């Protein structure tokens, strides 16, 4: 890392993580982790069914909060710090936010697909001892990932993503 300081300012640059990529990447990666935890929670052991429901609700609320907070914070930073040449561009901010809503579920899906095919560790599912339950959690994850990957172009808010997750879980449970 590099630290640059003057009398009134300090900047820290970590060159290892200096990356300019899609705005929705980090958010998508984190949401993907929460989705995998949600799928695991559907099938791993809990002290009670009430505990399972509470944890699943917590995960969905966390996804909602993350997305909404990201969008609000991005908008506030844009309004406060955007360069002058972008300030007057009608619809640019909305276009960027919509792009995040399209990209983020795609990245969430990709991280879980890689985990499902054992390209990277899947600790959320590794704690599920029952092989059938573990398989069901993996299949549910793949179904949700598929659903959000191909449904993402219609998402306008976190609610749309969460509706997809809940809807796919409900349909999957009917097949068990």
Question: How would you describe each model-predicted region?
Answer:
Residues 90-176:
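ATP/Mg2+ or Mg2+-diphosphate-binding catalytic cores
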Residues 43-46, 86, 132-133:
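Sparse recognition of residues in long alpha-helices and their boundaries
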Residues 12-16, 45-53, 98:
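Glycine- and acidic
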Residues 72-88, 153-158:
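Surface-exposed helix-capping loop/turn segments at secondary-structure junctions
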């Amino acid at each position: 890392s590099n630290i640059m300081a003057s009398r009134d300012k300090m900047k820290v640059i970590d060159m290892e993580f200096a990356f300019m990529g899609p705005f929705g990447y980090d958010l998508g990666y984190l949401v993907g982790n929460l989705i995998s935890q949600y799928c695991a929670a559907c099938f791993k052991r809990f002290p009670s069914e009430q505990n399972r429901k509470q944890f699943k609700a917590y995960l969905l609320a966390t996804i909602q909060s993350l997305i909404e907070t990201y969008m609000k914070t991005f908008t506030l930073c844009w309004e406060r710090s955007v360069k002058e040449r972008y300030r007057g561009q009608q619809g640019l901010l909305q276009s960027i936010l919509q792009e995040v809503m399209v990209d983020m579920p795609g990245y969430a899906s990709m991280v879980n697909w890689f985990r499902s095919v054992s390209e990277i560790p899947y600790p959320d599912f590794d704690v599920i001892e029952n092989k059938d339950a573990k398989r069901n959690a993996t299949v549910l994850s793949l179904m949700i990932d598929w659903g959000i990957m191909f449904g993402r172009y219609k998402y306008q808010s976190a609610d749309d993503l969460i509706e997809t997750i809940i809807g796919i879980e409900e349909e999957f449970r009917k097949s068990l």
